């Protein structure tokens, strides 16, 4: 309870009227101190007792006409009153000090508990990050299967709050947490007992399930349908992706060595390797080298052409494969954008930008050849770019400048890649400032920028090109 001067006992109030100085002192002490006493009622009782006793003493003295000692007694009363009040206030202060110390200790303990909780959460998240980083490698070992299983099991034990804290050299919450589609719709094509004839379709790979099904499986299915007397099998060249899919989805995909060893174990005699790579780049060269190491294990080994065929050394000389891809890709992009023709898109002020990967390999001339082919076909509003900016004219900045100078105010981005995986979803259409979508928008030159996230592999016309390349290899 909080006491105010008006709540004092009547006798005390009357008594304190004997001198304004004493009255002011009393009320000042009460007004300043009594709110504190509200926290401790017993202290209030003590001071009330002292005040009452002193006031009664004074009245008694006055009634007995101790006039000569009045001034002396007044001084004693005031002194005793002040001493009593100060004593109680000190006691209260000590009590409050003890209480504050207790409160501070509780707050500190609470903070320590919260800190320990955060520390435990971060520790659990860091352990998972380390496990992810351990399988984010390009080399498979005898421990890889167990490491993939351990990483997923540890992730599943985390709370949602802990999962958000996962951050490593390569690890992040998206490694296990991002939904990329239904992996059960895919087929790793690693079955045994397949007969003597095998077509091994080799891809870089992607951890995006929907894209893997639409693009890579789409090509594999088309080749299998066209070659019923052959068994189509799969291999990925990116162990990082193989580990990711295995750890997250439990789907085991062979790497090149595993696939070739499996073919040998299955007694395959005739092997045709069909790369889904775009061009004769570094990855294609590595693939050929790996196959050559197994050439003595089979009666015949043949490697088919990648999608764009032979490279050549002249940027203005284009083969039939590049021409076909230019026509097929452009037609698909125009249709997806809702136009009846490329000319209709041009009249609308819309340009199409096809983004490839880019490479420092001599095969980078293929991108220049693709742009030359677009120009030869009269596709004035089609531009070729690359993530890596190699060749130089294909960098995002240079492509933005080219589209702006051509006068187009609307842009449609689409990957010039077999698979619409990480590059298409993040480098092209991502929300980060360095994505092509963001950079085109930030340039301020275009009224609209849209993205079509679809790989070449899902286009029927492109699948037929791969089928033709496989047939050519079989017929060699």
Language-model segments: residues:
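Short, Lys/Arg-enriched N-terminal segments with co-localized hydrophobic residues
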Residues: 42-44, 48-72
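Bacterial N-terminal signal peptides that target proteins for export
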Residues: 73-81
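C-terminal motif of bacterial Sec signal peptides marking the signal peptidase cleavage site
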Residues: 89-93
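Bacterial signal peptide processing site
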Residues: 95-97
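Low-complexity, Pro/Thr/Ser/Glu-rich flexible segments characteristic
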Residues: 100-119
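Beta-rich interaction/scaffold domains
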Residues: 116-180
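Extended amphipathic ligand-handling, pore-lining, and cofactor/metal-binding catalytic surfaces
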Residues: 174-412, 417-476
């Amino acid at each position: 309870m909080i006491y105010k001067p008006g709540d004092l006992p009547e006798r005390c109030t009357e008594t304190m009227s004997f001198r304004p100085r004493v009255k002011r002192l009393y009320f000042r002490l009460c007004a300043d101190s009594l709110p504190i006493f509200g926290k401790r009622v017993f202290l209030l009782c003590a001071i009330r007792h002292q005040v009452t006793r002193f006031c009664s003493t004074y009245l008694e003295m006055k009634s007995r006409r101790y006039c000569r000692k009045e001034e002396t007694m007044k001084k004693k009363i005031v002194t005793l009153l002040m001493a009593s009040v100060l004593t109680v206030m000190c006691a209260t202060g000590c009590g409050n000090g003890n209480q504050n110390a207790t409160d501070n200790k509780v707050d500190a303990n609470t903070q320590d508990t919260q800190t320990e909780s955060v520390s435990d959460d971060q520790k659990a998240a860091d352990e998972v990050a380390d496990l992810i980083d351990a399988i984010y490698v390009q080399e498979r070992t005898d421990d890889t299967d167990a490491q993939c299983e351990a990483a997923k099991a540890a992730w599943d034990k985390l709370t949602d709050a802990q999962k958000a804290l996962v951050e490593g050299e390569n690890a992040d919450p998206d490694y296990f947490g991002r939904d990329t589609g239904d992996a059960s719709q895919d087929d790793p094509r690693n079955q045994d007992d397949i007969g003597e004839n095998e077509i091994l379709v080799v891809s870089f790979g992607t951890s995006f399930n929907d894209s893997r099904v639409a693009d890579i499986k789409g090509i594999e299915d088309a080749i299998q349908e066209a070659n019923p007397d052959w068994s189509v099998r799969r291999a990925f060249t990116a162990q990082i992706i193989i580990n990711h899919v295995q750890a997250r989805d439990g789907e085991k995909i062979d790497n090149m060595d595993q696939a070739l060893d499996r073919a040998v174990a299955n007694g395959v005699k005739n092997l045709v390797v069909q790369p889904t790579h775009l061009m004769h780049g570094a990855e294609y060269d590595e693939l050929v080298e790996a196959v050559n190491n197994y050439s003595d294990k089979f009666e015949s080994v043949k490697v088919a052409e990648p999608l764009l065929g032979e490279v050549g050394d002249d940027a203005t000389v284009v083969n039939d494969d590049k021409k076909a891809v230019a026509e097929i890709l452009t037609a698909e992009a125009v249709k997806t954008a809702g136009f009846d023709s490329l000319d209709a898109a041009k009249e609308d002020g819309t340009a199409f930008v096809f983004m490839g990967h880019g490479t420092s390999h001599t095969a980078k001339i293929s991108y220049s050849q693709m742009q030359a082919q677009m120009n030869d076909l009269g596709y004035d509003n089609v531009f070729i770019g690359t993530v890596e900016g190699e060749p130089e004219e294909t960098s995002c900045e240079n492509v933005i400048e080219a589209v702006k100078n051509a006068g187009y105010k609307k842009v449609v981005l689409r990957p010039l890649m077999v698979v619409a995986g990480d590059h298409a979803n993040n480098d092209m259409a991502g929300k980060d400032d360095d994505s092509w979508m963001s950079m085109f928008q930030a340039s301020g030159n275009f009224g609209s920028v849209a993205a079509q996230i679809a790989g070449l592999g899902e286009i029927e016309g492109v699948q037929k090109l791969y089928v033709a390349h496989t047939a050519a290899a079989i017929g060699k």
